[in-house]
Each structure stands twice: as structure tokens, then as C-alpha cells.
């Protein structure tokens, strides 16, 4: 159903980066990795390699077991972060996709410490974070997120 809705959004606006990014995510979560890569590569091209497109590609490659491709995307974002801002939330996701668990945990901690809105939104329920949920350090972050007065 989500895939059909995103395809319809692309039909309505074939220049929509967001519609392609969302379709790529839906295809990834459905296990349709080849299609997801194709859609997300198009999104990356049309957006001049927007961070979200690269994160989406890293996630699909990680889920597909193509760790070297995920690692290359993580390195690209790390290089970009050395020259400008890339959120710790996005770096945590690409590190985990590249099977760099310790680095992913460090970025997740930094994302929470910085109160990165994307982490607050995605940290608990976004499927690519599930691999981190079993780590006691990530569980501690989630408990901190639930602490009274944290969001006031």
C-alpha cells in the first residue's frame, strides 16, 4: 500500500526527491532491495547526493548484506562531515548499515546529546535502529528520552 502511494506521488510529480526517497524506504522495508537501490540512486542523482538519499542507500545495502557498498556511503558522509554538518543521526544509521556497531553507538549517543530532532523522531521506532535496540547503551538512551522534563 505504501509502495503504491509513493509511486502515485512520483506520477504526480516526477521531480519529487522526497517521493523517491520515501519509495526507496518502503521498497527496502519490503525486502525489494534491487528496486530500492534503483529508486534511491535516482533520488541521489536528482538531489546532488542529498544526505537522506545516501543514508537510504546505505540502509538498503546493509540490509541486503552488501557491507562494502554501505561502508563506501558511510565514508562519503564522514568525509562530508569533515567539511560541513552531517547529523549524528544519519551517521549512526550509515555506520550501523556498514556493520560498524561501536561507531553507530557513539553517533547515536551524540545525536541524543545534541537533541537532534531526527534522532528524537526516529530513534525509537525507525526500523534501521532496531539492530541497536539490544545494546544496553542504546536502551539507556531510550530511557533518558523518556525522563520527565527532557522535552520541555
Regions found by a protein language model. Give the residues of each.
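Alpha-helical protein-protein interaction modules
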Residues: 1-152
Amino acid at each position: 500500500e505504501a509502495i503504491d502511494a509513493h509511486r502515485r506521488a512520483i506520477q504526480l510529480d516526477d521531480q519529487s526527491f522526497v517521493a523517491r526517497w520515501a519509495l526507496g524506504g518502503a521498497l527496502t522495508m519490503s525486502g525489494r532491495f534491487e528496486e530500492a537501490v534503483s529508486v534511491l540512486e535516482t533520488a541521489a542523482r536528482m538531489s546532488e547526493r542529498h544526505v537522506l538519499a545516501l543514508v537510504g542507500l546505505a540502509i538498503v545495502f546493509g540490509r541486503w548484506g552488501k557491507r562494502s557498498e554501505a561502508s563506501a556511503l558511510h565514508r562519503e558522509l564522514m568525509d562530508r562531515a569533515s567539511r560541513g554538518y552531517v547529523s549524528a543521526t544519519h551517521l549512526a544509521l550509515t555506520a550501523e548499515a556498514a556493520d560498524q556497531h561501536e561507531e553507530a553507538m557513539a553517533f547515536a549517543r551524540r545525536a541524543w546529546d545534541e537533541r537532534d530532532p531526527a534522532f528524537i523522531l526516529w530513534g525509537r521506532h525507525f526500523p534501521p535502529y532496531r539492530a541497536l535496540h539490544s545494546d544496553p547503551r542504546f536502551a539507556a538512551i531510550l530511557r533518558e528520552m523518556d525522563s520527565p522534563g527532557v522535552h520541555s
